[in-house]
């Protein structure tokens, strides 16, 4: 550990270059370091690294100050400070070196640790570093190394009973980035939702980052061939970033139209907007098949009957009657519904529909159906009572 005079010199030099609003933090650094108040020092460092005005000085503070007592403060906080320092770096090889060096330092500390000396190992810090190393490989476009590291990391995480949220969040975030690179819409969608579910309250995401993620999730929901339930996404607060933006609000409307099987609205949006996003334009035929499937499901839901004619399905989905059988078979193969097809009489009998998160309008329709069902049961009860009076007498 450096002596106090050297630390004072380092901090004084950095303080002179820092934004005036950060000067009180440097005074705290000096005071807490001298008094060995590591927890308080860590809290002050967190404030510094979370402040956007600290960006130009982050790496130098990490190199010249934090690295001198990394073994005294929370291991995940040390990794967080390093990641904040490297956030805007385009030198990915340098970033890998920093991450590898810190990992080696943690491993060295653990190798020297005496059994039962009360100190905690640095396994959590190493796991977080591995996840961020995989992310850096992705940024270098080395997808093979990234995938290998993520697969090894997943095996390790699966064996653990308890994992800090910061680690699982980093793992899901890096994994979702990998799936985005691979255009794996299904995996990206579900992994990104897991990422959002593990976000700590203290984690700050910029508006631009939230909007980009909402956009990417919307595209994946539309193009994923195994994604037919959008309720969780539509109700997530992150979607507010595109609902309130005139450039992207149509994506939200498009997903809503899919959810409720509104063929006409979906068709009108596609005709006007699809050319704005080339990847959607490339998959237009798939999108039209998807709205037909969702319209079929909604037709079953709304009509509240188990038997539908080919004619009913044809009208709802705007498909020729000859294509109805194929559509129903496709829905059954995807696990969206269960039933049987009577080709001779052109009837489809539905026995089960996949559970899904439904909208407020759909809940209202369900309530109306329950009220109607209750009325019918009540009428039947009164009729049976009237006809059975002579028997009871």
From Swiss-Prot:
Residues 187-355 form the PCI domain. One of its GO terms (biological process) is proteasome-mediated ubiquitin-dependent protein catabolic process. InterPro entries: PCI_dom, PSD13_N, PSMD13, Rpn9_C, WH_DNA-bd_sf. Pfam families: PCI (PF01399), PSD13_N (PF22037), Rpn9_C (PF18261). Transmembrane segments: none annotated. GO terms for molecular function: structural molecule activity. Keywords: Proteasome. One of its GO terms (cellular component) is proteasome storage granule. Acts as a regulatory subunit of the 26S proteasome which is involved in the ATP-dependent degradation of ubiquitinated proteins. Present with 12400 molecules/cell in log phase SD medium. Belongs to the proteasome subunit S11 family. This is 26S proteasome regulatory subunit RPN9. It comes from Saccharomyces cerevisiae (strain ATCC 204508 / S288c). The gene is RPN9.
């Amino acid at each position: 550990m450096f002596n106090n005079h050297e630390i004072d010199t380092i901090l004084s030099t950095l303080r002179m270059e820092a934004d005036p609003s950060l000067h009180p933090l440097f005074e705290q650094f000096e005071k807490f370091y001298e008094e060995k108040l590591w927890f308080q020092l860590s809290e002050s460092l967190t404030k510094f690294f979370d402040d956007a005005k600290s960006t130009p000085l982050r790496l130098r503070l990490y190199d010249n100050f934090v690295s001198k007592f990394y073994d005294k403060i929370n291991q995940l906080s040390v990794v967080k400070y390093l990641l904040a320092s490297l956030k805007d770096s385009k030198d990915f090889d340098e970033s890998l070196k920093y991450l590898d060096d810190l990992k080696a330092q943690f491993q060295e500390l653990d190798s020297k640790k005496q059994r039962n000396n009360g100190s905690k190992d640095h396994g959590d810090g190493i796991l977080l570093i591995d996840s961020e190393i995989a992310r850096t490989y992705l940024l270098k476009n080395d997808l093979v190394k990234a995938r290998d590291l993520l697969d090894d990391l997943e095996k390790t995480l699966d064996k653990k009973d308890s994992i800090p949220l910061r680690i699982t969040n980093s793992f899901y975030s890096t994994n979702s980035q990998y799936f985005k690179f691979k255009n794996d819409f299904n995996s990206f969608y579900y992994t990104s939702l897991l990422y959002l579910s593990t976000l700590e309250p203290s984690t700050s995401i910029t508006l631009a980052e939230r909007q980009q993620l909402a956009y990417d999730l919307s595209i994946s929901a539309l193009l994923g061939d195994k994604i037919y339930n959008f309720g969780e996404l539509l109700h997530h607060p992150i979607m507010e970033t595109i609902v309130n933006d005139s450039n992207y609000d149509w994506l939200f409307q498009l997903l809503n139209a899919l959810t409720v099987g509104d063929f006409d609205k979906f068709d009108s949006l596609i005709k006007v907007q699809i050319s704005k996003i080339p990847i959607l334009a490339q998959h237009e035929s798939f999108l039209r098949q998807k709205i037909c499937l969702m319209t079929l499901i909604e037709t079953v839901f709304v009509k509240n009957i188990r038997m539908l004619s080919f004619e009913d399905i044809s009208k709802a989905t705007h498909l020729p009657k000859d294509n109805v059988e194929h559509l129903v078979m496709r829905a059954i193969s995807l696990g969206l519904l269960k039933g049987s097809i009577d080709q001779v009489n052109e009837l489809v009998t539905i026995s089960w529909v996949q559970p899904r998160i439904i909208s407020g309008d759909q809940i209202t329709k369900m309530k109306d159906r329950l009220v109607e069902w209750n009325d019918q049961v009540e009428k039947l009860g009164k009729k049976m009572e009237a006809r059975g009076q002579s028997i009871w007498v």
